[in-house]
């Protein structure tokens, strides 16, 4: 195998580090931006819905609220304050949040209570209905809320409509709970708005263009619409036959126009049926299915009700008031147009019921002119859908994984809701099932009302309540976190009731937590966790495991399956393995598994060594509710706090010296949030599963996490080892805990340390510097990044690796931003990556990593890779151990790495070093293996034959061993039980490969073989080690507790250590592992530094090296030195010397310490070992491609979700704008109604004027007088400046509508005839003029977009606008459209006037808008003095084009 060049390797490692740091920072920013956007989205949504409800109150002008009160309330809503619920509810917020969450998740109970409340004639029933929609279900922004609300509607159909004597009358009345909720839902549903806009925009605009006359079809009403003078002029003498005939002719003309108009609406309805909202269709089909079963209800009656629901409650309101739904925005609808729209709606309803109901004869003539099945066909499509039980999603869920964690509700709404529920339950009218459910809910709610006095106890309420209640059965990534900032989540509505309106103070909306816990955000998983998941998946063989099965979720949204239901997925995956050993798991995970670790640990449970075991675990994924609760308690480390641990040996699980620290960390208030985030990290791991397309549970290998941390390096460990008053026995216990299973304990320890940012020793773990505080942020970043990589596969157990594991946890603590960021990604988690890697190498990786230039010879299959990490001495031994390592790479690696790492990490003089290494060995071995380790002669040299002979039999004895172990404390069980076996075929293949090779170095150690190959130092080391082994042997019986094994249990697999598939693998753990560790111990001066440790530190040094400082070595030197050469002279040391010189020159003390430590470790290896280290680093670099892919996908997912949230925010802002403008329009209408006399006088005066200037002056004067009156009106006292401007525009539109005919055609028939002449001229031109006509001279480059239909559409609607300002804006939009299309055609140049005017002329010819000359005259008369800037420029171009068209001779 060709050894990679150290310069190239260093270059690639540095590039990788820089890229990863950059991605992490970007992801962190994206996460922060995402939360801000979500917060703004929910806040805006809440306000917008309240504005809409306030608008409805204004339209109804009911007795409960005057227009002035509505306006005042609108002002208050704009200043709404969002405050955390605890500020008003105090510690009782949790109880209220639980109540609301459980109520929200019980649609049946809500429907039953609403129906019962209406039967009791509760005064606040309607306000409670609004609260349910706006607060409990948050306006259905989230699809989960939409699904719940659809279920509420379904139950309302069953409980309310089905039980009613006359359901149709109840529905038409519009005041029942079903009608109100359906209206609120359909108005806010975005897919419904899309359908209405697509269906109604074009026909309504066409109607506005042609709104000259009322389309009245009743002769009597038609006559009444004209004054006597007009009747005489139009129809002749009243009572004559000519009069009657002319009236009938006009009626028939109106009928023909109306039929054409209605047919246009029906055509658009049919064309857009495909985009009819699925959720509304589901409601209609549920109604039809439910009511069809009611005795006494004919199918025709049920169909009529469905028609009422669709047309009367959904489509027709949008037809009559399109501006209220945003269908028409800038085109005013005058009285004539409104009447015609009402006629269209009436006819549509009649047509829908044709054949099912008898209509009066007067309408028969109209209906006979239509295709009788036209509307019925549309209804059949909607009603005919299969009535499935599960509500459909209205659209693709782009926010999967994001979930609401709070509700918005005012205090009065909350009390009103509770009062309503208590009244309902006291009425005895609820069904028994619902009554009991409601009683259980209300039992948790405080009876006394919380007062403001609770404001003094804000901090007594936990900011983040752990998800321990049934309400938290789904822990999802909160879009909006429950931080002190006013996160918004749902809207509450009943601010509508007058008593709630506080005239002088803005409303306070309580942000009440639903009780769900915090979760990890995407992209925050450590490198180790990602690699572990990848490797665990690889260990399953070539058969991919469907992650969607593991998580019970579709695997479509990779980016956010990450965030969604992370904890839930993990808990399911853990359930089987963990349920048996909660104590071990909770201990190991306790404070140690902060972000990333907990993830891999928690998820690791089911990851078996072979696919069959994994599938078996999956089959049992569904656990009882209690199991779920237990799992979650474990995740939040609440079981320990609550005394719920069911493992009697917990005290033994943690060594005496460490237990205090570990448990203490559980209760350490300073890291509560860190731990919660850590747990969230677990969730993220789940998410990662999706990102990597790996099986979730398999990806989350417990071992991976714990491995990352190393015992020797944790702060706690060091003090405990060196404590002068510590008994030897206790030290040995600790040592034992550190080794083997003890490695778990180490992991735990390290994690704990990492969880406390202030604890010195983090940096010690990586060997970078003495304390974490001393290390600059960048150094920590490097360390965290590298630990996993260093270890790559090997570093899992190394101290840095362990630290890296801690890294993520550490990150959750308050250190600097970059630190915490890196920690979150915890690249240092080598352990996890290590452990998993073995599997990856032999399995097909889900993401093929790019080939790094460094790895020229590192390709190849298992064969090539094994030699990289294994020494020739352990060929046979390794075969079995290696196999197991692959089956449960994490655990195995941990045990191994912890052995070696421990031996390497501690000075020989430190008794803890020997104790630890030996204990680890002992933990790792079972039966003869343990004896061999304790026995000096055997431990000094394990024979390959012994190892290999041990491999196969152990496989068979695994199950028996496991059973025998179950009754023992876990620290006494064979370590083997903690490791799952690899699939048998895989093992055999490995074994064959190993046998084929002459040497295989242990994957994680620099291998040294038997004493025959040991140098004099090694022999001496063996002698020294033998003494310690004897000491340990004597103390073994007393060895009681060990921390959870680093690789095994930190994962949260507590007992799974023994019972999960990994246990077997660990049992079979290779003597080869032990051999390595023994040999390492045997050579304290030459081999004491573990292979992984050296590799980890070397990676740190290389990834921070500057290319300028690369030493210039000859090719021969670089290719390695002969074995007899002094280790000091190997090429890595030479390279590091140059780096050290640079560090000294720069006086970078931290870097100097790192490089010196790395040189100390590396100098112990010969050139051959150095070559293998470099090859291993290169291979690790290649395998980290999956981590890069993870970061990339997280970034893409966050960006996509951010874009979707931005779009949602745009929709909400648009809804808010539409509601506000329509509110202003209604207020203006009320104002003008009070000024009707003045307006009538103004119109009469205007008719008398003849000069255009006089008319313009009078219009301006009258408008100004109305503006002044508005300013004095009480309704407008609280209006904002923007509202006043909108009001002035609305007043102008209304007044100009009233005088439009007088102002537009001052010369009446003469103007009309003039326009008709030009219209005919243009009509002839359009037949002969083409885009390439010589008279136009349109440049050829712009002809590809001809005939510019969008611009033609814009100008055709100019007749729909009645004010000069609106007509100018219409012309402006047409010109802008043309310029955009021209720019699109030629992107290399900006179109000028010479390019634009010919196209404008062509568009006007083809569009041929009516009344073109009158339009020019109207704008020139009433708006010319206000034309400035862009408007003036485009108006000049427009008039020039019209003049040019008049000069074109159509005959030529």
From Swiss-Prot:
> Where in the numbering of this chain does the VPS9 domain appear?
1312-1452
User: Where is this chain compositionally biased, Basic and acidic residues type?
Assistant: 775-786, 885-897, 947-968
GO cellular component terms? cytosol; endocytic vesicle; endosome; membrane
Q: How does it sit in the membrane?
A: Peripheral membrane protein
Q: Which residues form a coiled coil?
A: none
- Which key words tag this protein in UniProt? Endocytosis, Endosome, GTPase activation, Guanine-nucleotide releasing factor, Membrane, Phosphoprotein
Q: Could you tell me one molecular function GO term of this UniProt entry?
A: guanyl-nucleotide exchange factor activity
Subcellular localization(s) per the UniProt record = Membrane; Endosome
| GO BP, one annotated term | endocytosis
- Disordered: where is this region? 445-471, 571-611, 735-816, 885-912, 929-974, 1037-1063
User: Where is each Ras-GAP domain found?
Assistant: 147-385
Marked site (Arginine finger) residue numbers:
172
Q: Where is the composition biased (Low complexity)?
A: 588-601, 898-911, 936-946
Tell me which family the UniProt entry assigns to this protein: Belongs to the GAPVD1 family.
Provide the function of this protein: Acts both as a GTPase-activating protein (GAP) and a guanine nucleotide exchange factor (GEF), and participates in various processes such as endocytosis, insulin receptor internalization or LC2A4/GLUT4 trafficking.
Put simply, this protein is called: GTPase-activating protein and VPS9 domain-containing protein 1
Tell me the organism.
Answer: Xenopus laevis (African clawed frog)
